[in-house]
């Protein structure tokens, strides 16, 4: 097996404007012992050709061309080929700060970590030149045991540090030994990370912020109506409950977190129904909202959660009243802000 330290895995599709910047942000890393797998997932633009051009000049870059199968399949192809001691997954329309790999590898080597977690940036563009940047920092911590990590995981979930792959460095041996792959599903990052977290023993959190997740709201998946979102969120909640059962963690903090996380997703489902791209009639929307907020799980978990902001407290009022009409009005307002005032929406979302 090659002695390369880090395998960078990046699915590529329809990103000809951005993929060069993503690749160069890895080439500009102060840490140089890496290989990159840029997986062209049957893209119809020039993204694959751009990757080929970079690979022709840098032997550390390997391009795989395949038929379109989605980002999960692209990542999985690279997982099978990667030789690195560590795996790093990034998106092809984002970029990383130059010291990211160096700092992550240093932490992993020093503490024999199976998983290194860091902070990140979300850059939300609301015009071609203006953006709102949310900085997600975190206090550094070396978990002394698996149990300590599990009992503290609610705090990391709360800070949105455990959902995505691009703020993490993974042990390659851990991925291989547990035969972990990205499932072929929408929001594949989340179940992949849950499978990693399920039995991970050695976790280190470092305080640096490195990765820039770029969100262009006009093109964002979050501005689209999804008819199955409520069912997906219900499924997600089941995954989280199963994880905590597997861990044997049932303390007050974790119960409150699971309840609040579920209710926050319920609010997101209401926003989805009131999205302007949703073609349901007014009465159909109200009926769907009623179905969502009258769920027995909502009534069970509402008393267990603690709203963390005035914004969230206000959002909960019509749901506690079980008023589909008022919840509809509230969701419509948020959806309008989401599509019409991106800066304000990004700010409000960060305060949930």
Protein language model features and the residues they cover:
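Donor-binding/catalytic cores of nucleotide-activated saccharide
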Residues: 71, 92-228
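Membrane-interface aromatic/basic loop that binds lipid-linked glycans or pyrophosphate carriers
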Residues: 113, 275-352
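Catalytic core of nucleotide-sugar-dependent glycosyltransferases
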Residues: 208-217, 223-252, 268, 272, ...
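Short aromatic/hydrophobic "clamp" motif used to bind/position activated sugar donors
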Residues: 87
């Amino acid at each position: 097996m090659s002695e390369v330290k880090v395998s960078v895995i990046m699915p590529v599709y329809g990103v000809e404007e951005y993929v060069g910047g993503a690749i160069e942000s890895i080439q500009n890393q102060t840490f140089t012992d890496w290989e990159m797998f840029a997986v062209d997932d049957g893209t119809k633009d020039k993204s694959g050709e751009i990757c080929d051009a970079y690979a022709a000049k840098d032997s550390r870059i390997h391009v795989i061309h395949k038929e379109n199968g989605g980002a999960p399949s692209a990542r999985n192809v690279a997982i099978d080929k990667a030789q690195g001691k560590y795996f790093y997954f990034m998106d092809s329309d984002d970029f990383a700060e130059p010291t990211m790999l160096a700092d992550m590898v240093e932490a992993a080597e020093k503490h024999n970590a199976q998983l290194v977690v860091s902070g990140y940036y979300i850059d939300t563009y609301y015009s071609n030149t203006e953006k709102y940047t949310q900085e997600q920092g975190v206090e550094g911590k070396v978990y002394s045991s698996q149990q300590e990590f599990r009992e503290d995981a609610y705090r990391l979930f709360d800070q949105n540090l455990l959902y995505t792959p691009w703020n993490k460095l993974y042990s390659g041996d851990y991925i291989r030994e547990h035969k972990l792959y990205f499932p072929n599903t929408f929001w594949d990052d989340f179940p992949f990370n849950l499978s990693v977290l399920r039995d991970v023993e050695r976790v280190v959190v470092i305080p640096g912020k490195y990765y820039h997740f770029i969100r262009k709201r006009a093109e964002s998946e979050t501005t689209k109506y999804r008819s199955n979102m409520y069912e997906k969120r219900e499924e997600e909640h089941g995954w989280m409950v199963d994880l905590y059962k597997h861990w044997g963690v049932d303390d007050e903090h974790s119960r409150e977190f699971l309840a609040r996380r579920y209710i926050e997703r319920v609010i997101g489902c209401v926003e989805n129904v009131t999205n302007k791209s949703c073609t349901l009639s007014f009465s159909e929307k109200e009926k769907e909202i009623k179905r969502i907020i009258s769920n027995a799980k909502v009534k069970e978990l509402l008393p267990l959660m603690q709203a963390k902001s005035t914004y969230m407290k206000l959002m909960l009022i019509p749901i506690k009243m079980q008023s589909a009409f008022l919840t509809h009005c509230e969701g419509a307002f948020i959806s309008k802000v989401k599509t019409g005032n991106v800066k304000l929406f990004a700010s409000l979302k960060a305060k949930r």
